[in-house]
From Swiss-Prot:
The gene is MT-CYB. Heme 1 (or BL or b562) is low-potential and absorbs at about 562 nm, and heme 2 (or BH or b566) is high-potential and absorbs at about 566 nm. The chain crosses the membrane at residues 33-53, 77-98, 113-133, 178-198, 226-246, 288-308, 320-340, 347-367. It comes from Idiurus macrotis (Long-eared scaly-tailed flying squirrel). One of its GO terms (biological process) is mitochondrial electron transport, ubiquinol to cytochrome c. One of its GO terms (molecular function) is ubiquinol-cytochrome-c reductase activity. This is Cytochrome b.
């Protein structure tokens, strides 16, 4: 009798995705982040579900309900901080996952890459709406500032903003709909992640050399299942270290002040994982220009496969390309730092410079280094 794992309609899908999947034998720990993102998503959905049981999406009780979760619900503080810091872990894994894709040329798997970009946008939207829910000062003013950006759209902008708000300012209706969307989006992310995997398994994984690995594949289980379990344990250790010892280190103290539409916080800034994009937004004096730059800072990832002109797929054997890549990482770190600083000299100027360099590296320097390396190798 044939193995049930290989014949049963449902088990067969699972088998071909996680057990008998032919995998390149040389994929490094940089390939662990896909499974870590899956783990993060599961943690976020589980903790979020339990938080939603006790949370009330109403302006008069939202802040109190979060305090109630932390004080009165059994292990509520643990669930709340796991959810808040889980989001940070999610974005750390996301950025490393995208960085890996850029370094090793995984963007050549077009469908997988484009769905990945869609996943990134959806996750950013989910995180933004989740940040509004505790209804602290930074929640309220963050929601006001970011939703207001849509008013930059010519002619219909103001109507769109008021439509999203459900009134003439961020209020009860806004909080309620943000809770609704924040609840539904993770399930949409799960569906997109499945499609992401579906397309990846059509072509098979890339590998650190950037060369074809058709001649050297090994089964996913047990080799990579055990490797992913190790990665997952390390992730949970790091998350619990944050949750149990430094739960508020990545948050903003202003969010422990209940939302007050009459008092503006001295510095309105998003969570750390949005600071690079926020710095790019602020570095352009024009509102519409800033919004376009903000969207393009992520959407530029979709252009990268079209401007890839190297004869090699990966940066493994391209030292000049590596310099460009690590310059980009340094530039993103600079943007993240600038995003958290007040808008004054010299931060404003550094931000504008770093924003310009960001787009220049991706659109000019990286293709230029590729051409130079092709020439040096007489290709």
């Amino acid at each position: 009798m044939a193995n049930l794992r290989k014949t049963h309609p449902l088990a067969k899908i699972f088998n071909n995705s996680f057990i008998d999947l032919p995998t390149p034998s040389n994929i490094s720990s940089w390939w662990n982040f896909g499974s870590l993102l899956g783990l993060c998503l599961i943690i976020q959905i589980m903790t979020g579900l339990f938080l939603a049981m006790h949370y009330t999406p109403d302006t008069s009780t939202a802040f109190s309900s979060v305090a109630h979760i932390c004080r009165d619900v059994n292990y509520g503080w643990l669930i709340r901080y796991m959810h808040a810091n889980g989001a940070s872990m999610f974005f750390i894994c996301l950025f490393l996952h995208v960085g890996r894709g850029l370094y090793y040329g995984s963007y050549m798997l077009l469908e997988t890459w484009n769905i990945g970009i869609l996943l990134l946008f959806t996750t950013m939207a989910t995180a933004f709406m989740g940040y509004v829910l505790p209804w602290g000062q930074m929640s309220f003013w963050g929601a006001t500032v970011i939703t207001n950006l849509l008013s930059a759209i010519p002619y219909i902008g103001t109507n769109i903003v008021e439509w999203i708000w459900g009134g003439f300012s961020v209020d009860k209706a806004t909080l309620n709909r943000f809770f609704t969307f924040h609840f539904i989006l993770p399930f949409i992310i799960t569906a997109l992640a499945m499609i992401h995997l579906l397309f990846l398994h059509e072509t098979g994984s890339n590998n650190p050399s950037g060369l074809s690995s058709e001649s050297d594949k090994i089964p996913f289980h047990p080799y990579f299942t055990i490797k992913d379990i190790l990665g997952g344990m390390l992730l949970i250790m790091l998350l619990m270290l944050l949750v149990l010892f430094f739960p508020d280190i990545l948050g903003d103290p202003d969010n422990y002040i209940p939302a007050n539409p009459l008092i503006t916080p001295p510095h309105i800034k998003p969570e750390w994982y949005f600071l690079f994009a926020y710095a790019i937004l602020r570095s352009i004096p024009n509102k519409l220009g800033g919004v376009i730059a903000l969207i393009m800072s992520i959407l530029i990832l979709a252009i990268i496969p079209t401007i890839h002109n190297s004869k090699q797929r990966s940066l493994t054997f391209r030292p000049i390309g590596q310099i460009a890549f690590w310059s980009l990482i340094a530039d993103l770190a600079t943007l993240t730092w600038i995003g958290g600083q007040p808008i004054e000299h010299p931060f404003m100027m550094i931000g504008q410079l770093a924003s310009t360099i960001y787009f220049l590296i991706l659109l000019v320097l990286m293709p230029a280094t590729s051409l130079l390396e092709n020439k040096l190798l007489k290709w």
